[in-house]
Curated annotation (Swiss-Prot):
GO cellular component, one term: MCM complex
Name of the coding gene: ETG1
Phenotype of the disrupted gene, per the record: Serrated leaves due to cell cycle inhibition and to a stringent late G2 cell cycle arrest. The leaf blade area is almost normal while the average abaxial pavement cell area increases significantly in the mutant plants, accompanied with a decrease in cell number per leaf. At the bolting stage, younger leaves display a slightly elongated and serrated leaf phenotype. In addition, the root growth rate of the mutant plants is significantly reduced.
Physiological role: Associated component of the MCM complex that acts as a regulator of DNA replication. Binds to the MCM complex during late S phase and may act by promoting the disassembly of the MCM complex from chromatin. Required for sister chromatid cohesion.
Source lineage: Eukaryota, Viridiplantae, Streptophyta, Embryophyta, Tracheophyta
Protein name: Mini-chromosome maintenance complex-binding protein
PANTHER family: MINI-CHROMOSOME MAINTENANCE COMPLEX-BINDING PROTEIN
Natural source organism: Arabidopsis thaliana
């Protein structure tokens, strides 16, 4: 590691340069490396090898952008909304006989002169946004982190200036003097700061990006040394890297002059750093639900099912109260909340379990639907709601579409992250006619519900993207637009006042739900025969049962088991599923 002078948190570019010098002394050749990592990734992975170290790094959002300093280390947690291709940049240059690097910097600098050796490298551009539907409880309290971070930057400021001066002493004195009076460096990006970590050259972030809501700050992430297959569209990722952000700079393609290098990519130019901060990614990791829990902890391995049973009982009591003391509806709701796609066979998404609660009109929806929607926001990291009205279906853009005029993928309502819970409210639906847009949107919703896929329109062709979204439908009668896996009439017996839950209880339930969803599951050979016999008997009794119905029963059995913290199906839980299904069908008669 670079030592205190090159603290990876407050002076990451110093650590990059220091490791570059070490790599050169060990035989690293920039001329033949094509930008290959020289040890930076391992350095930062080692430095941030545990959650306590990672938690020291500020999370970049519309709040922290007001105080976090450019060229320091930040985290951005978001969804990859668009992949903008590759960008060329001058990654290394030779200053006299000494190699220097511009890697992990927005601006490529190198002394003027035809004899200068320059190595052009490549990096990928990802346009990332905060995860759609991300709920407020997932946000970390930033005030304490802000104070700690500003203390650290203050302590390291003098060290960084001193050490950077020592490094620049080795450069030609005339070059430095020219830099003070005129700038001997070519800038590949007009108006952006150079890559030096000297405090005197760090622009102060006194401004605020135009968009200031917590869910609106995007980020242009620049990826190095990572296989293209490692990251894909709609992945939820935590990027840890160097922030570059200048609210004063408002670049426009019309203002570019001859100093603008041809290597500047159009995508970057169209997203000025004053509006879209850049993050030069050093390391990254894909995020699961547990990473949004405070402390990133799951419940202990299910060595003691009693723990799961107790938490399950308390959560069931809460859900039952929300649903007007309808215990059966609460049971089905819990199974629905634990569902996830764990496999695909042909066009079938194995593990999905959509739920349609019926007998809800506008009045009852305003009570039970509103309470339930609010409760799910407090329990799940990502939740979205779609009003199924004729007007909305006819006007909204559900599917993402490629706009080749600006070379961007324009997001749609259904471009959401895996693990999102989606509520579809059909209680406001009135008779009317769907136009072509409405028909297309209805088909997109139906395909999402049945196959867990969303169609993306790339103009010249269309492509289906697999997803994993929990879908809960509220309607007065059985939905004709959304044929759910489970249809259940809601039968509340009373209206309960909304129970206030403590933060500790809410966190326990979140951990419980995340843990149960993460558990593996199997059916023992002995019980497998019992299940097969019961399914055969069920089909003989009701000839209308198809393979999808039988698959749904197995999915419910899986959810029932993991809800008790168990990874193997028991006879008791299988019989509970069969009884629940019997009660559901009784209600439908």
């Amino acid at each position: 590691m670079g030592g205190p002078a090159y603290d990876c948190l407050t002076n990451p570019l110093g650590a990059v340069r220091f490791s570059f010098v070490n790599a050169l002394s060990s035989g690293y050749d920039p001329a033949s490396s094509v930008g290959k990592d020289w040890g930076v990734v391992d350095l930062f992975r080692h430095y941030f090898s545990d959650e306590s170290a990672i938690s020291q790094v500020p999370i970049l959002d519309s709040s922290s952008i007001k105080w976090v300093q450019p060229k320091t280390l930040v985290r951005f947690r978001g969804m990859i909304q668009d992949m903008l291709g590759n960008e060329f940049y001058a990654g290394a240059y030779k200053d006299d006989s000494t190699w220097r690097t511009n890697k992990y910097s927005d601006v490529s600098q190198f002394p003027e002169g035809s004899s200068t050796e320059i190595q052009v490298w490549e990096r990928r551009l990802l346009y990332c946004v905060p995860v759609p539907g991300k709920n407020q409880w997932t946000e970390c309290s930033s005030q304490e982190l802000k104070n700690r971070f500003l203390d650290l930057t203050g302590q390291n400021r003098e060290k960084r200036v001193r050490v950077d001066e020592e490094m620049t002493d080795s450069m030609d004195s005339s070059t430095l003097e020219a830099g003070r009076n005129g700038s001997p460096f070519k800038k590949m990006k007009v108006g952006e700061a150079t890559s030096s970590a000297s405090e005197s050259q760090v622009p102060q972030t006194s401004g605020i990006p135009p968009a200031t809501s917590a869910d609106s700050l995007p980020c242009l992430v620049k990826i190095y040394d990572s296989p293209e297959s490692d990251l894909k569209l709609n992945d939820v990722v935590e990027f840890l890297g160097v922030l570059t952000f200048d609210p004063i700079v408002m670049m426009d393609t019309d203002t570019l002059d001859e100093n603008s290098d041809a290597l500047s990519e159009a995508e970057s130019v169209q997203m000025p750093s004053g509006k879209v901060p850049r993050l030069h990614c050093l390391i990254h990791r894909k995020l699961e639900t547990q990473h949004f829990l405070h402390g990133s902890s799951l419940l202990p391995e299910p060595k003691s099912p009693q723990i799961f049973k107790e938490i399950r009982e308390s959560l069931m009591k809460y859900l039952t109260g929300l649903l007007g003391n309808d215990h059966i509806a609460a049971q089905f709701l819990l199974l629905h909340l634990l569902s996830k796609v764990h496999g695909r066979v042909d066009n079938v998404a194995v593990g999905k379990l959509s739920l349609n609660l019926i007998h809800l009109n506008k009045e009852s929806m305003s009570i039970f639907g509103t309470q339930l929607s609010g409760a799910l926001k407090s329990l799940l990291p990502f939740t979205q709601s779609i009003p199924l009205t004729i007007e909305y279906l006819n006007t909204a853009s559900f599917g993402p579409k490629k706009d080749y005029g600006i070379n961007r993928l324009m997001p749609g309502v259904l471009q959401i992250a895996d693990g999102t819970h989606l509520i579809l409210d059909e209680t406001e639906l009135q008779p009317g006619t769907l136009n072509s847009v409405g028909v297309e949107n209805a088909n997109l919703l139906k395909n999402l519900l049945e196959c867990q896929k969303v169609e993306y329109d790339f103009q010249y062709y269309k492509m289906e993207m697999a997803t994993d979204v929990q879908m809960l439908i509220f309607s007065e009668g059985k939905s004709n637009i959304m044929p759910a896996d489970l249809v259940l009439p809601l039968q509340p017996s009373q209206v309960n006042s909304l129970e206030v839950i403590t933060p500790e209880t809410a966190e326990t339930w979140r951990c419980y739900l995340a843990t149960c969803k993460s558990l593996s599951h199997s059916i023992g050979q002995e019980l497998q025969q019992v299940v097969e016999n019961d399914l055969v008997a069920a089909r003989q009794t009701d000839r209308s049962l198809g393979s999808q119905d039988l698959s749904r029963l197995l999915t419910m059995a899986r959810m029932m088991s993991v809800s008790y913290g168990e990874t193997t199906l028991s006879l008791e839980h299988w019989q509970m599923v069969l009884e629940l299904e019997r009660l559901r069908k009784e209600r439908l008669k």
